[in-house]
From Swiss-Prot:
Gene3D superfamilies: 1.10.1040.50, 2-enoyl-CoA Hydratase, Chain A, domain 1, NAD(P)-binding Rossmann-like Domain. It comes from Pseudomonas fluorescens (strain ATCC BAA-477 / NRRL B-23932 / Pf-5). The keyword Cell membrane does not apply. The active site is at H451. The keyword Hydrolase does not apply. Disulfide bonds: none annotated. Pathway: Lipid metabolism; fatty acid beta-oxidation. It comes from the Bacteria. NCBIfam families: FadB (TIGR02437), PRK11730.1 (NF008727). Keywords: Fatty acid metabolism, Isomerase, Lipid degradation, Lipid metabolism, Lyase, Multifunctional enzyme, NAD, Oxidoreductase. This is Fatty acid oxidation complex subunit alpha. One of its GO terms (cellular component) is fatty acid beta-oxidation multienzyme complex. The lineage of its organism: Bacteria, Pseudomonadati, Pseudomonadota, Gammaproteobacteria, Pseudomonadales. Substrate binds at D297, N501, Y660.
Length: 715
């Protein structure tokens, strides 16, 4: 063994060729943490000092190559002063440059996923051989930053500016054949031939058949584009990418600016440009929020995985209530490998459910994401039925009937008598208490909530609700089934609205107050979309359904009368009475028309102003900032209450629930991180300015205590 560390080893293979192998002990994947970088420094120095070494193969001892930097280290690193952070980045880059400058040929053997710093390591090698099953990419823009280990320098010089911009700005993973096509790798081979192919390649370079120094040279020089070509490549790309990313996600455009700024420099000077831009992005609130989201997501996955130890395997599922929701649940279950019975009380419901599943499958086939054979297999996994005849071997039943407690209790009690004693029953309710529904059951310990969000195939979140009598086995099995369906489950405790809807309705409450104060709902929508929401509150209510919003508002008012009950009628009342139910019947706040592609689009409908007139109680002058505060303060404070009440266990889960469940702007990180970004004391002072609007705007005693003590939710 030439070098042996905890993350890297260097061993002799044959004929002066050595293998530099990444295999981080105690971890399931390789990543560039401080330890790995330090050992890479030592390994490169060892190779450089050994005159007997003729060539180097870089490999991984794990199923993946390297997943990138250790994101957990970013939080502390990014708090360092700018100059210190730049110096640290350049010091790390010197390791990659020294590896690139070795006086022997180097080949990276990419066996699995190589992302971020993992790909940047490969770019520093002279040649790259890739397993056909592997994927490579630079996903840093998804964290609000860009590649910081030479990716913006080496990739454009290797595959051309246009291709590099596309790879870096999109941040997606790229398949082997696409990597070969653009020249990011030199060969693609079967996984079991990878090491042999890398050996053969390095031998040909050692023999002089391939000139590795000539291959290396373009990466050390300036970009081969003249001034006009540069202007065309960069200015066009900046305009397009800015339009795609939007103003709240600066990283993709900053990456292009960095490539442009460094285009006329050689490698070392270009790396300095990269480091300066990287540090600038690292200090943005968008980067801090997106990195926080990534870490929250990891925490969520870890918590969900912990339930695997006691969960039962769901081999056969069932859904009660077909229709669009039932069809969506059936599609999601069957497409991820769990066969499902889909029961309804009439043929029409069954037809609707099957049509929904078929529509989603055809869409995947049309886009080339699924074969016709796979579609047939998934459809065969959905068995429609009007009876309970086959429910005897079902492991878990999702109840998805109408949102009415009496109807749900009748259906749940009925199905309980048709299934095994240990079958889990899960109600897809959005607001009704699980403990209340459980009163109709003989085995309440087998009952939980399983709240899917609409549309099921697109929304990543599932709330798993623990009732007063729900067993840990029932909770764990439901979490495992949600994961198997490809969803991100969050376990919450029972209360009206659970986490997401409990927090959403105060947001709608702020909106109702604004409309009743004479503020134009179109203006409110525009401001909240600019703030970062995927759609404004009026449009969102139309999409959800005014009737659904009306019912949910009443449930929440009953559950939390001290702050959510309003004796005055509001916009949702008059729209509901006027039978303007939103998208579902073509009129709500907006009117809806079908475009040429058959999709609904919203259009202005002046007649709605007459409908709203009776609930406009005053004409109040408000600024854009006021509108944001009227909307966001109630949402944030209710999230705080959910955490304090133990509805959700951690701040990370609360924030991820809002991002995944209602599209909270990711670059703001979630409600609690948003409070942190303002400052807890500053947020409390801000809320106090709006105290006259009612109890929804009153901070809790505990939040005031946090403000007094200088505390935050994420430290």
């Amino acid at each position: 063994m030439i070098y042996e560390g905890k993350a890297i080893t260097v061993k002799a293979l044959e004929s002066g060729i050595v293998e530099l192998n990444f295999d981080l002990k105690g971890e399931s994947v390789n990543k560039f943490n401080r330890l790995t970088l330090n050992e890479l420094r030592q390994a490169v120095d060892t190779i450089k000092a050994d005159a007997s070494i003729k060539g180097v193969i870089v490999s991984s001892g794990k199923d993946v190559f390297i997943v990138g930097a250790d994101i957990t280290e970013f939080v502390d690193n990014f708090k360092l002063p700018d100059a210190e952070l730049v110096a640290g980045n350049l010091e790390a880059n010197k390791i990659f440059s020294d590896f690139e400058d070795l006086n022997v040929p180097t080949v990276a053997a990419i066996n699995g996923i190589a992302l971020g710093g993992g790909l940047e390591m490969c770019l520093a090698a002279d040649y790259r051989v890739m397993a056909a099953s592997a994927k490579i990419g630079l996903p840093e823009v998804k964290l609000g930053i860009y590649p910081g280990f030479g990716g913006t320098v080496r990739l454009p010089r290797l595959i051309g500016a246009d291709n590099a911009i596309e790879w870096i700005a999109a941040g997606k993973e790229n398949r082997a054949e696409d990597a070969l096509k653009v020249g990011a790798v030199d060969a693609v081979v079967a996984p079991d031939k990878l090491k042999d192919a890398a050996l053969a390649l390095v031998k040909r370079a050692i023999s002089g058949e391939f000139d590795y120094k000539a291959k290396r040279q373009p990466k050390l020089e300036k970009l081969k584009l003249n001034a006009i070509e540069q202007m065309m490549a960069f200015e066009t790309a900046k305009g397009f990418v800015a339009g795609q990313a939007g103003p709240n996600y600066p990283a993709p455009v900053e990456a292009i600016k960095t490539i442009q700024k460094a285009a006329n420099f050689g490698r070392d000077k270009a790396l300095e440009v990269e480091a300066a831009g990287f540090v600038k992005l690292a200090k943005t609130s968008a980067a801090q929020s997106l990195i926080g989201l990534f870490l929250n997501d990891q925490e969520l996955k870890k918590k969900a995985k912990a339930y695997d130890e006691i969960a039962k395997d769901v081999k056969q599922a069932a859904v009660l209530g077909a229709g669009i929701m039932g069809g969506g649940i059936a599609y999601q279950s069957a497409s991820k490998g769990t066969p499902i019975l889909m029961k309804d009380i009439n043929e029409h419901g069954i037809e609707q459910g099957l049509a929904e599943a078929a529509k989603l499958l055809v869409g995947r086939v049309d886009k080339g994401r699924m074969t016709a054979a796979k579609m047939a297999e998934v459809l065969n996994g959905i068995r429609p039925t009007l009876s309970y005849g086959d429910f005897g071997n079902v492991d878990l039943v999702v109840e998805a009937v109408v949102e009415n407690p009496k109807v749900k209790q009748i259906v749940l009690a009925e199905v309980e008598g048709q299934v095994k004693e240990d079958t889990i029953l899960a109600s897809n309710t959005s607001t009704i208490s699980i403990s209340l529904l459980a009163k109709a059951l003989k085995r309440p310990e087998n009952f939980v909530g399983m709240h899917f969000f609409n549309p099921v195939h697109m929304m990543p979140l599932v709330e798993v609700i623990r009732g007063e009598k729900s067993s840990e086995l029932a909770v764990a099995t439901t979490v495992a089934y949600a994961k198997k369906m490809g969803k991100n489950p969050i376990v919450v405790n029972d209360c009206p609205g659970f986490l997401v809807n409990r927090v959403l309705f105060p947001y709608f409450g702020g909106f109702a107050k604004l409309v009743s104060a004479g503020v134009d709902f179109v203006r409110i929508d525009k401001i909240m979309e600019k703030f970062g929401w995927p759609m404004g509150p009026a449009y969102l209510m139309d999409v959800v359904g005014i009737d659904t919003g009306h019912h949910g508002r009443d449930v929440m008012a009953e559950g939390f009368p001290d702050r959510m009950k309003d004796d005055r009628r509001s916009a949702v009342d008059v729209l509901y009475e006027a039978k303007r139910l939103g998208q579902k019947n073509g009129k709500g706040f907006y009117a809806y028309e079908t475009d040429k592609k058959g999709k609904q689009k919203k259009v202005a409908d002046p007649s709605v102003l007459e409908v709203l007139k009776p609930i406009v109680y005053e004409q109040r002058e408000v600024t854009d900032e006021d509108i944001i505060n009227w909307m966001m303060i109630p949402l944030c404070l209710e999230t705080v209450r959910c955490l304090e009440d133990g509805i959700v266990e951690t701040a990370a889960e609360a924030d991820m629930g809002l991002v995944y469940g209602i599209g909270f702007p990711p670059f703001r990180g979630g409600a609690l991180r948003y409070i942190d970004s303002i400052g807890v004391a500053e947020f409390v002072a801000l809320a106090d300015q709006y105290a006259d609007l009612g109890a929804l705007y009153h901070p809790t005693a505990k939040l005031r205590e946090m403000a007094k003590n200088g505390q935050s939710f994420f430290g």
